[in-house]
């Protein structure tokens, strides 16, 4: 069974002709959401859909799918993730990573102390932020910047970082 990776969420329907509103979560929307591409709805079992049309509307991507021409056909997909298989992933430039590669990394600071494991990645602005939960303390929100992340070893599943002063509040 292939691995699937999230590329967006169907947040609602649009009109009555089977169009859906998608909140895109991929860095490659033009590649992922092309007419003719196959995407999968995270249902059980997965539902394969062929994209029939793509357009932008009020900050969201609107999609229609081949053979889905009525709102009642797509309504069950509301709130579900859209996914692609690993074979649809493209090679990245050096120093770029898929979220799937970062989530689960053990993060070690400049003193050699383990801060924890990345369990989520936020995209609040110009750079991503790694979320590293800590037992009984507030999460560490580590910015993904060259000045902070010194090295990533995907084979060892570890990232070495320099923690900016004041970033970790151990008082709580």
Curated annotation (Swiss-Prot):
Protein's UniProt keywords contain rRNA processing: yes
Record-stated family: Belongs to the RimM family.
SUBUNIT field: Binds ribosomal protein uS19.
One of the record's GO molecular function terms: ribosome binding
Originating gene: rimM
Domain notes: The PRC barrel domain binds ribosomal protein uS19.
Subcellular locations according to the entry: Cytoplasm
Keywords in alphabetical order: Chaperone, Cytoplasm, Ribosome biogenesis, rRNA processing
Family matches, as InterPro entries: PRC_barrel-like_sf, PRC_RimM, RimM, RimM_N, RimM_N_sf, Transl_B-barrel_sf
Predominant localisation class: cytoplasm
Entry keyword annotation includes Amino-acid biosynthesis: no
Pfam families (alphabetical): PRC_RimM (PF24986), RimM (PF01782)
GO term, biological process aspect, one: ribosomal small subunit biogenesis
PANTHER family in alphabetical order: RIBOSOME MATURATION FACTOR RIMM
Assigned GO CC terms: cytoplasm; ribosome
Name of the protein in question: Ribosome maturation factor RimM
Domain PRC barrel, chain residue ranges per copy: 94-167
């Amino acid at each position: 069974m292939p691995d699937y990776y999230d590329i967006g969420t169907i947040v609602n329907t649009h009109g009555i002709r089977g169009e859906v509103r998608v909140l895109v979560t991929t860095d490659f929307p033009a590649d992922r959401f092309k007419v003719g591409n196959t995407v999968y709805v995270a249902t059980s079992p997965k539902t394969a859909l062929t994209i029939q049309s793509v357009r932008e509307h009020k900050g969201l991507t609107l999609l229609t799918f081949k053979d889905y021409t009525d709102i009642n056909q797509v309504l069950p997909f509301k709130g579900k993730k859209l996914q692609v298989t690993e074979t649809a992933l493209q090679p990245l430039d050096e120093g770029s990573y898929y979220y799937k590669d970062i989530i689960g990394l053990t993060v070690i600071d400049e003193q050699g102390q383990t801060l924890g494991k990345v369990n989520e990645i936020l995209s609040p602005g110009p750079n991503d932020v790694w979320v590293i939960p800590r037992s009984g303390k507030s999460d560490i929100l580590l910015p993904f910047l060259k000045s902070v992340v010194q090295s990533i070893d995907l084979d060892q599943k570890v990232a070495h970082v320099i923690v900016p002063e004041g970033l970790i509040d151990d008082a709580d």
